[in-house]
Amino acid sequence: MKPFTLPRWRFTNCCGHHWGHPAKPAAAEGATRREFFKTAAVTAAGLAALASEVKSAAAQGRVFPPPPPSVSPIEGLIDFHTHCAPDAFGRAVDDDESAQAYMARKAEAVVLKNHFALTADRAWLVRKHVPGIKAFGGVALNGPSGGINAEAVQWMWRMQGGFGRVVWLPTFDADNHVKHFKDAPEGIKVVGADGKALPAVRDVLKVCAQQKLVACTGHASPTEALAIIEAARDAGCDRIVVTHAEFEVVNMSVEQMKKAASMGAKLEIDALGVLMGPQAHLPFMRHWRHVSYKESAGHIKEIGAQNFVLGTDLGQTGNPSQPDGYAMLVSGLMAEGINREQIITMGREVPGKLLMG
């Protein structure tokens, strides 16, 4: 193998002395001219290709992810619907980790939801461990809580700290849910044969009215949710939310949303919606219909931002973090024509009044 040599220029001064790299044997004049033109052609082609690449790169714009935003897109907002460990289902983070992540993004508050266990006590612990953020909890009236159980609600709001502010009517155990997904022959009913809210539901709503708790419709059908809203008004409960109104099992029409809003209910929009559908990366989410940002933005424009509340419904193992999901929801809605003022209304003002008003 020949040793590596680096070619250098050879200089000759006016006296004929040489220095630099030894000269190669002189080539014939014709060969020298051919090599010159060959080299020039190759160089010109290379420069042209380089110029083309530079122009192409310029046309493509940035090739790196954008820098972190100077202002957090979720600063001051409230996530009205989070799921954390410990739970019966796989959760990516626990309550404290979720709160810390939200505090780092300058969010205002989080609502801790669990389908099977109380979260009013967990909210107190989060506030103790992560004092920079407000945490709220509540109770979901599924089987483990005794179903539609006013007594469970009474003890929930009495939990130390007073941070148990939300009551979810049946979710996974709801009659509408189990029949829709064929999980069981029947579940916990919220309305009778006459289509009216059952007495047990009315008892729960009376407690919500007395203690200024937020009543959420859970996984009730659209017609059931409207019956619950009517019963809430009769009971004097003016803090009522249609749980993820756009999602599968609930899936209200625009007209039903308008009616619910006219009766004083707020409609929940969640970041999880855009991740669901046949294209979902997690198998369980393929059974729920896809809700696009465009669809949600259309509902906001038609019904009014003052009638909506934002959340994520995130926390599942394998899904985006709750703060990232919330930021995606905000940017997705704004890309569809929703302005920052409307985001503040839905993400801060409306849930703030429900929880702390």
What are these regions (language model features)?
Residues 9, 15, 37-50, 323-357:
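Mid-to-C-terminal alpha-helical segments outside catalytic/metal-binding sites
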Residues 270, 303-322:
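Short acidic/histidine-rich active-site segments
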Residues 25, 29-38, 46-63:
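N-terminal twin-arginine translocation
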Residues 36-37, 60-134:
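An N-terminally biased module of ancient metal coordination in phosphate/nucleic-acid-related enzymes
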Residues 83-85, 115, 138-144, 170-174, ...:
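Active-site beta-loop-alpha junctions enriched in small/polar residues
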Residues 1-32, 58:
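N-terminal secretory signal peptides
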Residues 40-41, 64-69, 95-100, 120-125, ...:
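Histidine/acidic residue-rich metal-binding segments in metalloenzymes
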